[in-house]
């Protein structure tokens, strides 16, 4: 388990894209979950349907979802120390990225993700059975958040900024 203190310094500055924060939001009686991923530079949100709340479900859900992101834009993932990330080594191996863990009881170290989880509760209220949501429905929710202008992005949307990086920035993509 690699602590956040060993994370590259460019992650904190948000100047280099490809660094993600991840978490699970849990549903009714902690029996269902949705994986949340937020890219730190662009604030792009990706939601992953989970089959359960265990480590295998988290690994499979995050792997399935992050495989659609260009390799150059999935460098690191910062997570809390929840038991659902017990299989993080296999996730890192499958995606060829590094996984870092925030210090215990330090949600501010993943503030972008915590803020996003709060925004998601507008669409996925606490106490909801999240297992009933399809990946298509989760993608529609993520689209709503990704097309919302953000002050921190000079009122561009996360989707606009991320798309621009994917299509127009050879430096950001390492090509």
Tell where the protein language model's regions lie, with residue ranges.
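Short catalytic-loop micro-motif centered on adjacent basic/acidic residues
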Residues: 47, 75-78
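Coil-to-beta-strand transition motifs
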Residues: 30-32, 40-45
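Mobile-element integrase/transposase regions
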Residues: 1-34
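Short small-residue beta-strand/loop micro-motif enriched in glycine and branched aliphatics
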Residues: 43-48, 101, 126
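RNase H-like two-metal-ion nuclease catalytic core shared by retroviral integrases
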Residues: 79-92, 101-124, 131-143
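Active-site beta-loop-alpha junctions of metal-dependent nucleic acid enzymes
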Residues: 26-30, 47-71
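C-terminal domain-tail junction helix/linker
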Residues: 126-175
């Amino acid at each position: 388990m690699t602590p956040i203190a060993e994370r590259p310094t460019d992650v904190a500055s948000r100047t280099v894209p490809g660094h993600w924060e991840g978490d699970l939001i849990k549903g009714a009686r902690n029996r269902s979950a949705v994986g949340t991923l937020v890219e730190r530079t662009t604030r792009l949100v990706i939601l992953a349907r989970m089959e359960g709340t265990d480590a295998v479900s988290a690994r499979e859900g995050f792997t399935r979802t992050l495989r659609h992101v260009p390799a150059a834009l999935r460098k690191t993932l910062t997570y809390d120390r929840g038991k659902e990330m017990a299989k993080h080594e296999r996730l890192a191996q499958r995606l060829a990225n590094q996984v870092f863990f925030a210090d215990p009881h330090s949600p501010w170290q993943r503030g972008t993700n915590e803020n996003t989880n709060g925004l998601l509760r507008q669409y996925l209220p606490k106490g909801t059975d999240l297992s009933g949501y399809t990946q298509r429905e989760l993608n529609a929710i993520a689209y709503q958040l990704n097309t919302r202008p953000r002050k921190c992005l000079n009122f561009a949307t996360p989707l606009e900024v991320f798309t621009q990086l994917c299509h127009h920035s050879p430096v950001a993509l390492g090509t």
